[in-house]
């Protein structure tokens, strides 16, 4: 062997290894599933490369996975003829570069998660140390020489050029030196059961090196004629039998070895759905996704006609840890062409919002040598995609029939559905049927648009909703006062993505979606008398509206008498086409935003005042007596700033607001302001205040 180079494990990988080695796990058997799954991935890669360049298979034309238990040396080897690894791959992939999932997996483990989740985090190789004290990886890639990686997980590993070892041709051989209490994994029966349990549906042949004992009878003469063989495979039976002719016969046991194919199942998607058991679907799902739990729902179908393909789609029980990690290639639907695996992160096959759906698609119509580039232009793929989306929505509707299952599904994937409303204009209406919201009338349950429509008041033309940070924040919002009083139901949209979704949805079942926080809210059930009364009130408050607008300047676009609030003195509404307060909050939180757009979209605020509120009535009287009264200006600023808060906006200058409150407290407590002039020295003058803040600060 050439000289060995020693490398230190990256810190996180080292921590992971010590967790795996020093913690007791009951289901250590998953190591085999993980290593076979890695072998299958390596075979996928070389098969895909060979579609465009046949010579890639020259080193080893056969594609296989082999398991070799060796009882005398207490080793189990997993051999594949996959793509293999170069020296750089060995160093990087097995030790010096931590994958994004390493840290997350450790956190999950420490939080009590099951070790069998390891494959989902991309660190399945290290599960070998659940059963092995030492691991040796021999590998040969077409572009490099054969190398050996070795480690006892003691903080470092060695990599050596393999000059003496048996040439692999191409591929990887992982040899596990089993711990003394893990020797069950050398038993043929145990290995067969494990492959059947976890890896039955791997699409490459998995062979086990098995031992066969046969009995053979030979006569004494034959025995003497043959030279004595040093054959450990022959065992002489003590039992001798005399034949009629007086010659003796001997029984000899012969031990031979052969490769036995263990996974004989044909691909599950080629079978009829009615022939497949729940358990088979569950086993296939687990081998496909590395999930340790069963799936929530499955859809198995075939499309026939001009285009033919078969598919199985699964919905997991929970969202993966990196569901919205845009840097990660989506490994959701595996694409096969005539049973040959082509690729598994094919973005053209399913839209991004359905990236949580797992499954396989097998088409007979696509060309075998299809590449990522030609996929984009492929018409067949567009038809497949359309069908997959349709079937996914059907599957979600089937889940919705069971309330408990749908609650689980909605908790995990509601954001995806809302993203679908935003992205998929063709299926917007169908996806809208799947949405659920809390409302002013739904209590602890969530309601659908469909159910909302059945409960609408007579003469109600619109669906009312309010957006905000949380259910608690919107429940007592001043915007809901009149709507609640008149018995209208209002949907609470409290997920950040709701803002984007409702911006695209606009209507449901011919009924417009109307925000309770934007101007233009019209309630149709007003009597003539109420209208008359409101007009009179508007007139009497006209001057106050002008005074408030003068004091606030550019902070608000206009000041009007409200017909949406009942108890609160005032509120701030946004323009019908501008951002809501909640949207403004969301946009402020985005680092990479267009600030010119922010200034334009967020500055259209209208102050609505409540003519029936005592504070407003008193303010009207004071303003009419003397509109330059200092207390009027102070009250208007204070009302504006509290309205910002109750309407869901944020304060640009919280210190000024606090100082204003303190001044009011002093007035209430009859403390003479002049005594504390110094203390209040920093308090800005109100007139300046208005001028200073008149330019609405951009949401920057």
UniProtKB/Swiss-Prot annotation:
Keywords: ATP-binding, Chaperone, Cytoplasm, Immunity, Innate immunity, Nucleotide-binding, Phosphoprotein, Plant defense, Stress response. Induction: By heat shock and infection by avirulent and virulent bacterial pathogens (P.syringae). The modification Phosphoserine is found at residue 219. A motif (TPR repeat-binding) lies at residues 696-700. Functions as a holding molecular chaperone (holdase) which stabilizes unfolding protein intermediates and rapidly releases them in an active form once stress has abated. Functions as a folding molecular chaperone (foldase) that assists the non-covalent folding of proteins in an ATP-dependent manner. Molecular chaperone involved in R gene-mediated disease resistance. Required for full RPS2-mediated resistance through interaction with RAR1. Possesses probably ATPase activity. This is Heat shock protein 90-1. It holds the Pfam family HSP90. It is found in: Cytoplasm. Disruption phenotype: No visible phenotype under normal growth condition. In case of infection, plants are altered in RPS2-mediated disease resistance. It comes from the Eukaryota. Residues 215-249, 673-700 are annotated as: Disordered. Residues 673-691 have a biased composition (Acidic residues). The keyword Flavoprotein does not apply. Homodimer. Interacts with RAR1. Interacts with OEP61, OEP64 and OM64. Interacts with POLL. Interacts with HTD1. InterPro entries: HATPase_C_sf (IPR036890), Heat_shock_protein_90_CS (IPR019805), HSP90_C (IPR037196), Hsp90_fam (IPR001404), Hsp90_N (IPR020575), Ribosomal_Su5_D2-typ_SF (IPR020568). One of its GO terms (molecular function) is unfolded protein binding. Expressed constitutively in roots only. After heat treatment, expressed in most tissues. Levels also increase after heavy metal treatment. ATP binds at residues 34, 38, 80, 85, 93, 99-101, 120-125, 172, 372. GO terms for biological process: chaperone-mediated protein folding; defense response to bacterium; innate immune response. The TPR repeat-binding motif mediates interaction with TPR repeat-containing proteins. GO terms for cellular component: cytoplasm. Belongs to the heat shock protein 90 family. The lineage of its organism: Eukaryota, Viridiplantae, Streptophyta, Embryophyta, Tracheophyta.
